[in-house]
A protein has these predicted regions:
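Glycine-rich phosphate/pyrophosphate-binding loop regions near the starts of catalytic domains
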Residues: 11, 19-174, 185, 194
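Short, acidic (Asp/Glu-rich) active-site segment that either coordinates a divalent metal cofactor
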Residues: 160-210, 231
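N-terminal amphipathic/basic leader segments beginning at the initiator methionine
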Residues: 1-28, 315-317, 329-340
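Active-site-proximal betaalpha loop/short-helix elements
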Residues: 103-105, 198-274
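Acidic, Ser/Thr/Pro-rich beta/coil linker or hinge segments at domain junctions
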Residues: 297-344
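Helix N-cap motif at beta-to-alpha junctions
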Residues: 282-288
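Short Gly/Ser/Thr- and Asp/Glu-enriched loop/turn motifs at secondary-structure junctions
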Residues: 41-42, 272-277
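Short amphipathic alpha-helices in soluble, non-transmembrane regions
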Residues: 289-299
């Protein structure tokens, strides 16, 4: 019996290695992604090495629940997350791989929508999906669809970004409002309704990073504050660089509805996940240039300078503190435990 992707759901045969698998690859994945390397049909995508001789590579797996949410779906996350991770090295992101684990019975129209979103987001980021894999597990063996992506980029000569580069006197910037993605996922999962529409911030930020590096070549580091939010990112920087950091709470951009939701749920917005924001640490003399570049870039219009890097007091441990609007300070710790499982 011949099957095709006119089937309304994913079947075990779509992962069999036979005719059904070839059809889902050809008619769902290749039709959407269609890079020359992928269309060759080999077990590996072959790509040119950069002239600089250095590459950056990252991989990430995506299990978000729900898989569709305001502002995106698991496919957009799968591209943006890995593109942004590679881009934090200062690399020009070039190629992605993608691996799908599909549950038997998953609706085919939803899979097509996810794949099409991935193709559109990859195009927006200027990257090619050059290799991939598909597996199908029995009903109950997965929750619909899981996606793994890996990315490769070319690191320009002379670029050496690292969370260990932060120095006292440096300035901390963020590219936009915090907490949007985490609150969207929580509201969708728990059936919470808000008076305004909050959308995930999932976005590819490789072009924004390139613009900031061009304007502020002394930039120390970038990082996307995903799980654990800004709190985890800054604590990681402080520990890697053996410094202290101070954040001006009033300077941190947060949507009023997101702030209200965090207060209602008992969350610290600085610990809530983001999927389309970037944290940068730059020398003080380049801070204005970096901020202008962020605000001029797509997805950076709400960028702000939010804090500074401080020297450690004698005998003190690396730490992050927040200066509140009341003039007091509090320690900003990394998230303890799991605030919201399957956020990405």
């Amino acid at each position: 019996m011949s099957h095709s992707v006119t089937d309304s759901t994913v079947l075990l045969g779509h992962g069999s290695g036979g005719q059904m698998m070839k059809r889902i690859i050809d008619e769902v994945f290749l039709d959407a992604f269609g890079s020359p390397e992928l269309l060759e049909g080999n077990d590996a995508g072959v790509a040119a090495l950069p002239a600089s001789g250095r590459i950056a590579m990252s991989t990430d797996s995506f299990v978000v629940s729900p898989q569709f949410f305001p502002g995106g779906n698991i496919g957009r996350l799968a591209v943006c997350g890995t593109v942004n991770d590679v881009a934090t090295s200062g690399a020009n992101v070039r190629y992605l791989s993608c691996g799908f684990i599909l549950e038997e019975g998953y609706p085919m129209d939803r899979l097509r929508q996810i794949v099409q979103t991935m193709a559109e987001t990859a195009h927006e980021a200027g990257v090619s999906i050059i290799t991939g894999d598909t597996k199908v597990v029995e009903r109950g063996g997965a929750d619909g669809v899981y996606i793994n992506t890996a990315g490769v980029g070319e690191v320009p000569t002379g670029v050496a970004l690292s969370g260990a580069n932060c120095r006292p006197g440096d300035v901390i910037l963020v590219s936009g409002t915090l907490g949007d993605h985490g609150i969207v996922i929580m509201s969708q999962r728990e059936g919470l309704a808000f008076s305004s529409t909050i959308e995930s911030d999932a976005a590819p930020l490789n072009h924004l990073i390139a613009d900031v590096l061009a304007a502020a070549p002394g930039t120390r580091c970038f990082r996307d504050p995903t799980r654990g939010g800004l709190a985890s990112t800054l604590n990681e920087f402080a520990q890697a660089s053996n410094v202290a950091m101070e954040v001006d709470e009033d300077a941190v951009p947060v949507r009023p509805d997101v702030q209200a939701a965090c207060e209602m749920l008992g969350y610290d917005v600085l610990q809530v996940a983001n999927e389309g924001k970037m944290v940068a640490v730059v020398p003080a003399e380049q801070a204005d240039a970096a901020l202008s570049a962020m605000r001029a870039a797509h997805y950076g219009e709400n960028a702000a300078i939010i804090g500074r890097v401080l020297p450690l007091a004698e005998g003190a441990r690396p730490a992050v503190r927040v200066r509140t609007g009341w003039g007091s300070t509090r320690i900003l710790d990394m998230l303890v435990g799991e605030q919201l499982p399957r956020i990405c």
